[in-house]
């Protein structure tokens, strides 16, 4: 039984939350782009859709868990075969977010933002996260680091007034 479009969009979105891939890259990702190496499973894109640069992204178990079963599909088969347009996917994500009680604007790009912010918040360094995202300039990645710093400031400020000041 083929998964519904809603399920395919959800799987691809969550996969991107753990890989940082753009919609244009995940929608064209084939089984042939996924390689087993001595270091683990990696995605190897010869040319990213947006930047036309080569990108290699290691896959962690969380990312792998969101991938559909390959079965006997050829290497040329797209991994997330049901994705049509980013607009259609964004409409599905908006509906899924609403059903889940999420009151924020969610688009496919949100997964990329989620990956970057979480990788930095977990202690990943700016340079490595920048390379994983395929950014040409570390300044582009700095936007996500600023979000993490804002969150740290909010957390520290929660402690104000907790104890009597001198």
Where are these regions (language model features)?
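Conserved catalytic core of the tyrosine transesterase superfamily
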Residues: 1-14, 35, 49-50, 84-85, ...
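Basic, Lys/Arg- and aromatic-enriched nucleic-acid-binding interface segment
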Residues: 1-23, 27, 73-74
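Short basic/aromatic active-site micro-motif
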Residues: 8-10, 83-87, 103-123
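Phosphate-coordinating loops and pocket residues in cytosolic domains that bind phosphorylated ligands
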Residues: 28, 36, 143-146
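Catalytic-site neighborhood detector that most strongly recognizes the C-terminal catalytic loop/helix
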Residues: 48-52, 133-158
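C-terminal secondary-structure termini that scaffold catalytic or DNA-interacting sites
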Residues: 73, 160-166
């Amino acid at each position: 039984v083929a998964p519904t479009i809603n399920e395919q969009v959800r799987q691809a979105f969550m996969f991107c939350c753990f890989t940082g891939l753009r919609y244009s890259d995940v929608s064209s990702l084939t089984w042939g782009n996924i390689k087993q190496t001595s270091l683990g499973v990696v995605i190897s894109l010869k040319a990213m859709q947006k930047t036309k640069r080569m990108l290699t992204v290691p896959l962690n178990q969380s990312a792998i868990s969101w991938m559909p079963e390959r079965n006997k599909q050829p290497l040329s088969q797209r991994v997330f075969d049901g994705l049509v347009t980013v607009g259609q996917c964004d409409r599905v994500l908006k509906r899924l977010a609403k059903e889940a009680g999420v009151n924020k604007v969610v688009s496919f790009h949100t997964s990329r933002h989620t990956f970057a912010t979480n990788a930095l918040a977990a202690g990943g360094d700016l340079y490595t996260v920048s390379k994983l995202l395929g950014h040409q300039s570390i300044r582009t990645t700095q936007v996500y680091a600023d979000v993490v710093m804002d969150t740290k400031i909010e957390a520290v400020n929660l402690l104000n007034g907790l104890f009597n000041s001198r």
